[in-house]
Structures are given as structure tokens and as C-alpha cells.
Amino acid sequence: MNSSHHIPKKIRVAHRIKLERCQSWEEGFHVFDEESALAVEMALATGRPLLVRGEPGSGKSQLARAAAQELNRRFISEVITSTTEGQNLLWHYDPVARFHEAQMLAAEAAATALRQENWEEDNQADSEEIPSVPPQPEALSRKKSIRYKKKKILPQKRQHLFQAISAGAGRGFLPDRGSADLHPGNSISPGPFWWAIDCVSARQQIGRCRWPLYQPGFDLGFSLEEAAAQAQRGFVFLIDEIDKADSSLPNALLEVLGNGGFHVPLLNQTVRVPPGFASPLVIITTNEERELPPAFVRRCLVLHLRFDDEHYLRTWWNRQVTQRADQFHPDRALVKWLAERGELHFEHVFSVRVREKAAELLVRDRREAQQAGLIKPGQAEYLDLLRALRNMAAASSEQQQLALLEQISPYVFIKEAQE
């Protein structure tokens, strides 16, 4: 981009950002270019989700983590699978837990009723008039029988207890608190979208829920005041690999993406961003395994991450023109671009020659894989190769590293079955 273009203000461009360990994510580094930084700022300005397209290993998911760190926002992520349901991103309802609660309450109420019945019988037996003459043997045996009955639950009472437990909440055995304990709201867990939109009401709801089915990847011990302070800063919510699910999942998100909120019928409650709180930055990634519904895509801004795209590489090359004596060539530019990324991730670890050699091997294998219609290695594989080289004791000098690259690169770059 030339100097007349808008320069992002909230995201630092060409800056080495160290990413802290987060949930299951390891430490790492990320570098925003102008295009991705500007896309993030536009998503913030419009309130629209940012759909990030690109091949696997191009840094789509990491972009969301880096954005959260740069914007000082809490990071929430959900990796989509073929079994993920759209509603579960909003809220979870657990009917099994509610049924279990009903059974527990019924058993408790039946046991209370049985204890009351035994107590009344005991009082009746104790209040029997004691005769003025010495008791006869038959009377003694009768009193022993009464004492025996006090200590023993009769078979018909056991049957009465079993029937009460089996009947659940429908037989009138529940105490007064039963109707409140069995409210459907006690079985609803806020999903990740709820936390991202309004973490205060989500914090309240998680305190009400008996058996939460979803927990965000951070400490729930904060107070409502702390939750409100967090809500003012906002969240970054990553929906990772949405193309793993069928079209029902993105279609289930049309309301929340279009309106910025959703309704929970069982609570008769609408979840939306409260006044004064920051709207979430929603970043959605796809590897293009499935086509996304047009109505879903229309609600998103779209960023294409194509690091080997000729137009992108030419733009990057032209910004470096004062430092480059060579004429532009796509493969040569990609090698230089990857070598620069390698230095940003492994600062002062490898020489330029080693980083460029690793990049040349990647570019060669990418071209061969593309011609054969196979999976192409990408930026992630390039960084994995350098990481392995750094950690292998046999590669301490530049010459050793250059020799080892040829040996180990197939383990990283060639992933298809060989005939």
C-alpha cells in the first residue's frame, strides 16, 4: 500500500507480537500486515464478524489471538466439529440434569413424608395407657412388637417410598421449593456467544445453573463488578473452522450475527450488548472444505489470507524496493517473505542463508504438490521446520543446519500417502 492509504491505528503493523500461553494455545508470535490489521479495525468499526479465508497453516486462528492481545480484550474460542450445534454456541439446555433434579426432589420429599408417618405412629404407640396391674405375657409380646415396628420400615412403606421416587415431580411429593428448583433456567448454561456479548448476565446465569455444560476458558471467580469492567473492554470470539459443520450451524447464527443478540425462550430473556459495553469482535475461520451459505457470508466482512498470491507478494515487494536490487519474481518474493517471517518468529537464531534455504524447499514442494493436486505445505509447516532445526542438537552450525534441512524437510512438507 502507498502512503495515501489508511494506516491502522489500533493494531501495530509489522510488529513482532509475543502471544502468551492461552487455554490450550502455546506461546507464539504474530505479525500483522496492513491488510489484516485494517480488516480487524473495519470489523470493529462496523460491528460485523470477520470471516477469514485461507488454506490451513496460514495463521487464521492466530490472527484472532493476536487481535485480542493487541486490543486488550478477553479471548474466547470454539473449535467447530461435525457434531457442533449452532444453538450450543448461544446456550445449552440440559433436560437430563433437570430430570435428575426432579427425581432427587421426589425422593427427598417421599423420605420426609415417610419419616413423618413413622413419627406419628411412634407417638401413638407411646401414648397408649399403661395398665395398673402387671402386664400379662401377651401384653409384653405386644409391646415388643410395637418397639420392633418402630425400628423397622415395613415392606408396604418401602413400596410407598419406591413409588414416590418413581413418580418424580408429578405425584405431589415435592416440597414448596420444588417448583423453583425445577425451573428450566436452572438447566441452561450460557454458551460462548453469550459470554462474548454480555458476560455480566452470563456470570449471573452460570451461578444459577446447577450443572453447567459449558465453561469459558478463564477463571469464573470474578465478581459482577469485575465482569462489568471486562465487558467494557470487550471480547474477541474465535469460531474456528466453521466449514467443519454442515450448513445448519452458520444458518443458526444468522440472528445473532445480523442483530447482535439473541433470545432465550426458556428464560424469556434477550441477550444483547448492554449500553456502555463493547461489542465483541467475532472472527470466523474457514478452510473452504464446505461452501458457506450466502446469507451467512453476506453478514460478514471477508479477509483472504493468501501469502503466495502474486498481487499480495508484489505489493509487499514494492514496499521493500529500496532494499531489493532483484527484479520481482513470485517464487523469489515468497522465499524472501518467508525468510522475513522466520526471523520474526526465531529472532537471531538462524542466518539468512538457512532461513532462505528452508523457504526454497517449501516453495519447491508447494509447486510439486499443487501440480499433483495434493495438500500444499504452508507457513505453519515452514515454521515447524525451523523449530525442529532449532531444537535438534545435531544442528549447531550453519553448515550442519543446511545439510539437515534436506534430510528432515520431507517429514514436514510431504504429508500425502506415497505409492
Model-derived features: positions:
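C-terminal regulatory/interaction module of P-loop NTP-utilizing enzymes
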Residues: 1-419
